[in-house]
């Protein structure tokens, strides 16, 4: 009889790292993800940006934070991502961010 080992369940969901650019909605953040790709004909490296709406249940992320988001089921018309963790906090103080909002 073959012996089976219990391996930890790995997530097959996509993950992205980006910058929080807006926290004006309740429990929702807007994350800007930048990627670089090579131009097909000329070979020059081009930066491309895309914005994703992500669910932030505890409202822990602030503008300027670098966060990791992961794919999830559709939560609304635009939200298909959720906040996994805050990687690096912004240099701005939370009081300044609240005044800017």
Swiss-Prot record:
Signal peptide: none annotated. It holds the Pfam family Ribosomal_S17. SUPFAM superfamilies: Nucleic acid-binding proteins. Keywords: Ribonucleoprotein, Ribosomal protein, RNA-binding, rRNA-binding. GO terms for biological process: translation. GO terms for cellular component: cytosolic small ribosomal subunit. GO terms for molecular function: rRNA binding; structural constituent of ribosome. The keyword Ribosomal protein applies. InterPro entries: NA-bd_OB-fold, Ribosomal_uS17, Ribosomal_uS17_bact/chlr, Ribosomal_uS17_CS. Gene3D superfamilies: Nucleic acid-binding proteins. CDD domains: Ribosomal_uS17. It comes from the Bacteria. Belongs to the universal ribosomal protein uS17 family. One of the primary rRNA binding proteins, it binds specifically to the 5'-end of 16S ribosomal RNA. Part of the 30S ribosomal subunit. PANTHER family: 40S RIBOSOMAL PROTEIN S11 FAMILY MEMBER, SMALL RIBOSOMAL SUBUNIT PROTEIN US17M. This is Small ribosomal subunit protein uS17. It comes from Koribacter versatilis (strain Ellin345). The gene is rpsQ.
């Amino acid at each position: 009889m073959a012996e089976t080992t219990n391996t930890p369940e790995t997530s097959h969901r996509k993950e992205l790292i980006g910058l929080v650019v807006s926290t004006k909605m309740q429990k929702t953040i807007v994350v800007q993800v930048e990627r670089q790709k090579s131009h097909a004909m000329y070979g020059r490296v081009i930066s491309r940006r895309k914005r994703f709406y992500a669910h932030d249940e505890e409202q822990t992320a602030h503008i300027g934070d670098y966060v990791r988001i992961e794919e999830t089921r559709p939560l609304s018309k635009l939200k298909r991502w959720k906040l996994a963790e805050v990687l690096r906090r912004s240099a701005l103080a939370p009081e300044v961010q609240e005044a800017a909002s």
